Amino acid sequence: MIWLAVYDIEDDGERAKASAILQAWGFVRVQRSFYVGRMPRGKAADLLKILQRHVKSGHIALIPITDELLAKALELGRPPYAPLKPPKYAQIYVV
């Protein structure tokens, strides 16, 4: 399953730690506080527990999304998470 990880963390140290943890777990940064990764639901729950130990301020959400829904995303440009797309993914270009 694909997971979107988003956060709003005020503390700089906690924010840096959350970023490092997400990237260590294979998540790819899309924007400053938005990551995407692939893992089973049980592993995502484990990840959230680890994040909970290190982040005391702000909010973190792990949002599941299916391959089918990601394939329907409307995008412009090449996203950094393209390898997570199912093989049938067709890039949409707006002219």
Swiss-Prot record:
Task: Give the cofactors, semicolon-separated.
Answer: Mg(2+)
Q: Which domain of life is it from?
A: Archaea
**What EC number(s) does its UniProt record assign?**
3.1.-.-
Kindly indicate whether the keyword Metal-binding belongs to this entry. yes
What is the species of this protein? Answer: Pyrobaculum aerophilum (strain ATCC 51768 / DSM 7523 / JCM 9630 / CIP 104966 / NBRC 100827 / IM2)
Q: Name one GO biological process term.
A: maintenance of CRISPR repeat elements
User: Which residues are involved in binding Mg(2+)?
Assistant: 8
Q: How does it assemble?
A: Homodimer, forms a heterotetramer with a Cas1 homodimer.
Q: What does this protein do?
A: CRISPR (clustered regularly interspaced short palindromic repeat), is an adaptive immune system that provides protection against mobile genetic elements (viruses, transposable elements and conjugative plasmids). CRISPR clusters contain sequences complementary to antecedent mobile elements and target invading nucleic acids. CRISPR clusters are transcribed and processed into CRISPR RNA (crRNA). Functions as a ssRNA-specific endoribonuclease. Involved in the integration of spacer DNA into the CRISPR cassette.
Range of residues in the leader sequence: none
Q: Would you tell me the protein name for this molecule?
A: CRISPR-associated endoribonuclease Cas2 1
> Which GO terms of the molecular function aspect are on file?
metal ion binding; RNA endonuclease activity
| Cross-referenced InterPro entries | CRISPR_associated_Cas2 (IPR021127), Virulence_VapD/CRISPR_Cas2 (IPR019199)
